[in-house]
Amino acid sequence: MEKRAVVLYSGGLDSTTCLAMAKADGFAPYAMSFSYGQRHGFELEVAKANARPLGAVEHLVVDFDLRRMGGSALTDDISVPKEGVGSDIPVTYVPARNTIFLSFALGWAEVLGAFDIYIGVNSLDYSGYPDCRPEFVSAFEALANLATKSGVEGQGHFSIRTPLINMTKAEIIKAGVALGVDYSWTHSCYDPESDGTSCGRCDSCRLRLKGFAEAGLVDPLTYSGR
């Protein structure tokens, strides 16, 4: 039987790198994306177009609407900050988003008989999100093995794999390039133009551009703000 893993895949730089890493680790990757009412929906279109070409065995898109709860510039009519990356938890934080995403991934993993879940969280070049920290990942992994039939019956041990967690954005990009990732097939912007062109000024764009610059590489995307 193939060794399966669920990969949380948004269409962004980090999750695309994770998908390549899961393949390199010998897993058959099953990609999971989310349509949760995000304003930056172009990223999801990128994910839909590229999951299979990038090597996903299946690509499951889960639909739910976090706009009904509110609380984030990524789902509400709140301006996305363009003044630079700060140290506080930003308004682009989506309440409990990674907990929600990982819960869906855990359910699918149990159905698939997969005990490995990849998520591209990063605790170095990140924007202050509490659900990108190692402490959060460890806590969710413990929960996964307590809250599932497979875990309780000892069929296997669920592992939340975070290969990017201690890497800078430049290191992530270099690792992806070494694995053959084409970053023109990714999208990172929180506030793109209607045609999908990245703004070049939001936190996500700034971190991406900084990563490419520090890696000594040219970002293949075009930006409206530059």
From Swiss-Prot:
SUPFAM superfamilies: Adenine nucleotide alpha hydrolases-like. It comes from the Bacteria. Pathway: Purine metabolism; 7-cyano-7-deazaguanine biosynthesis. Keywords: ATP-binding, Ligase, Metal-binding, Nucleotide-binding, Queuosine biosynthesis, Zinc. Its EC number is 6.3.4.20. It catalyses: 7-carboxy-7-deazaguanine + NH4(+) + ATP = 7-cyano-7-deazaguanine + ADP + phosphate + H2O + H(+). This is 7-cyano-7-deazaguanine synthase. PANTHER family: 7-CYANO-7-DEAZAGUANINE SYNTHASE (PTHR42914:SF1). Zn(2+) binds at C189, C199, C202, C205. Its cofactor is Zn(2+). The gene is queC. Gene3D superfamilies: HUPs. Binds 1 zinc ion per subunit. Belongs to the QueC family. GO terms for biological process: queuosine biosynthetic process. ATP binds at Y9, S10, G11, G12, L13, D14, S15, T16, T17, C18, L19. Catalyzes the ATP-dependent conversion of 7-carboxy-7-deazaguanine (CDG) to 7-cyano-7-deazaguanine (preQ(0)). CDD domains: QueC-like (cd01995). NCBIfam families: 7-cyano-7-deazaguanine synthase QueC (TIGR00364). One of its GO terms (molecular function) is ligase activity, forming carbon-nitrogen bonds.
